[in-house]
Amino acid sequence: MSQFYLVAPSGYCLNQEAAYRGVQRLQEAGHQVLHQEVIPRRQQRFAGTEHQRLNDINQLATLEGANRIVLAVRGGYGASRLLPHIDWQALVARQRQNPLIICGHSDFTAIQMGLLAKGSIITFSGPMLAGNFGAEAMDPFTERHFWQALRSRNLPSNGRAKARIVGPWEPCGAAIWR
């Protein structure tokens, strides 16, 4: 059994039914789903006030327990507004001492890239609560590979690809915020 800890640093979850279906699906599989109060929370287009959403992220540094899976409820917009105020030092220290498994994509990627930039912290670009775990029928490929990525030390890497790059190629490098 795993413990999922929900965070909602971005947009309000428009599909509440899907989010609660995701919670139910995880619980029926034997997992605990904590911090569900973020699902219905709303401030204009966001999943709460900036203070609430920032607190969701900063409190991860002191979250008790090991091997917790931090799962974003959904993406959208809003995480980038939090970046200058996140306690990166505390989050990086936590991840180095007692790592949380942090998973999401879309707008949540800004926070994941912040962890990478500030401390070389590895996170998972993977399913989120509402759109994936809460889908009417969860994609079996997504579910299988999510658990494989979290539980296996050996990930499949036998694929090869060849492609011709088209269009202008512009190498870039910059901070994700100022």
Language-model segment annotations:
Residues 60, 114, 172-173:
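Hydrophobic structural segments
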Residues 1-66:
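ATP/NTP phosphate-donor binding region
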Residues 16, 80-83, 112-114, 135:
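Short glycine-/acidic-enriched loop or helix-start segments at secondary-structure transitions
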Residues 33, 69-71, 103:
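Structural motif
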Residues 121-178:
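Conserved anion/nucleotide-ligand pocket segment
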